[in-house]
Amino acid sequence: AAPLLLIISNSLKPLNELWEFPPRLIPRQPTFENYRNLASIMSGSLVPFAMYLANTVFVTAVGTGGHIILASMCAFPLAKKRFPGRQVIFNAIVIALMFSGTVTVISNYMVMAALGWIDSLLSIVVPAFSSTLGLYLMKQFMEQVIPDSLLEAARIDGASQWKIFWRIVMPNVKSGWLTLMLLSVQTLWNSGQSPYILSEEKKTLAYALNQIVSGGVARAGVGAAVMVIMMLVPITVFIISQSNIIEAMASSGMKE
């Protein structure tokens, strides 16, 4: 909590207090000047602040929703079905976790170019659907939380695979997809410039605010204000979801 409090404190400090040593947690003369300067800088931008924000909200909401749905649907057969090549597929997923996104930038660019998605928000949203971490996480949750006897009982009662997935599996792995939601929101909300986005009006809020942070020493306080703004959404989502995650973990602890 200390680094978070220090960032908030720095965003409320005038410039002459930012470089004091040792640093003070509570400003002597708290001010919102850094936030006013940030608003002034953004108002002078070629692209309105609302457009950066709208792009970020779209990318975060659609990317997170698609990621949760696709990861869960792919994890279900890997966790609860027995078919040839199942372990090979899972091993490939684990190996894919060893590589960073930088390794696949060139191949991803070639795919985006072939699909005509260069300079489109789809080039950020669609790759977010296929994160291997989400698939791995949901598979582990389903294996540990969902007993096979529960699924078998649902089949005996005449439930279809689709109904089993949406009515039984997803509610019982709520803690898993809420955790995945937190990770996805944090990643997408804070995603900076994409190599596939060229037009200024299609860039995200993180890119615009990072440009402000790079303005130099005179904007150090503004940089702290930027960090506070970028942390607001992930922290809010965490606070809202925390109790639900704990409740879901407690209520979904079923045994054979």
Label each PLM-derived region with a short phrase.
Residues 1-256:
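A hydrophobic, multi-pass inner-membrane permease signature
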